Amino acid sequence: MPASMFSIDNILAARPRCKDSVLLPPSAPVVFPSLHGDSLYGAASDYGGFYSRAVAPGSALPAVGRSRLGYNNYYYGQLHVATSPVGPSCCGAVPPLGAQQCSCVPPAGYEGAGSVLMSPVPHQMLPYMNVGTLSRTELQLLNQLHCRRKRRHRTIFTDEQLEALENLFQETKYPDVGTREQLARKVHLREEKVEVWFKNRRAKWRRQKRSSSEESENAQKWNKASKTSPEKRQEDGKSDLDSDS
């Protein structure tokens, strides 16, 4: 056996590239989630920038299956292959690993050999957009929107609503459900919003009350310290003179 076969280049070249991405040949259709029986299709060539070539260009992918719901209520387009497995070379020759998967397999949305994890698209957006005609930049934008942290919607109250809420808060700190519903109809808000506002307002009121009590205690201590009798001051001065003599 020649010694060149044990060189570093040959050893590294023989190893399977586990970081290779799953491919889509140009002739294969891209299946997106079904919407009440209607499927959205797009050409695989539109997504050439997302997937590398791992099979021969002339090979076909038969038996296109259905998509499924991924994690966090996001749809993932899946391309299921019934014949030869398509995927990274390090995973094609091994049986399903169950809970222990190869590091090249995406943790979510990947259903074994032959599945293609497409760009995540929020399911509520799919009825209003033709996913098959999106460009690479638009798909990247969808990925960024998916990765962003979902921000909690914050209600902005008008001056009239705040005035009505404050007036009721001055009357009672804990209004019942009927009172909250009556106020909600008056200021055109939902009763849940009024309830949340009162919870936050009570928390703010307690903080203000606690801070004001601490300030009053500190003021009383300061007043007691400043109102020391002149006799006590003179006695302190005499004791200082005696100690010096």
Swiss-Prot record:
CDD domains: homeodomain. Keywords: Developmental protein, DNA-binding, Homeobox, Nucleus. Pfam families: Homeodomain. The keyword DNA-binding applies. It comes from Gallus gallus (Chicken). This is Homeobox protein goosecoid. GO terms for biological process: regulation of transcription by RNA polymerase II. Its main location: nucleus. One of its GO terms (cellular component) is nucleus. PROSITE patterns: HOMEOBOX_1, HOMEOBOX_2. It is found in: Nucleus. PANTHER family: HOMEOBOX PROTEIN GOOSECOID (PTHR46643:SF2), HOMEOBOX PROTEIN GOOSECOID-RELATED (PTHR46643). Belongs to the paired homeobox family. Bicoid subfamily. Residues 203-245 are annotated as: Disordered. Residues 150-209 bind DNA. The gene is GSC. InterPro entries: Goosecoid-like_HB, HD, Homeobox_CS, Homeodomain-like_sf. One of its GO terms (molecular function) is RNA polymerase II cis-regulatory region sequence-specific DNA binding. Residues 229-245 have a biased composition (Basic and acidic residues). Residues 219-228 have a biased composition (Polar residues).
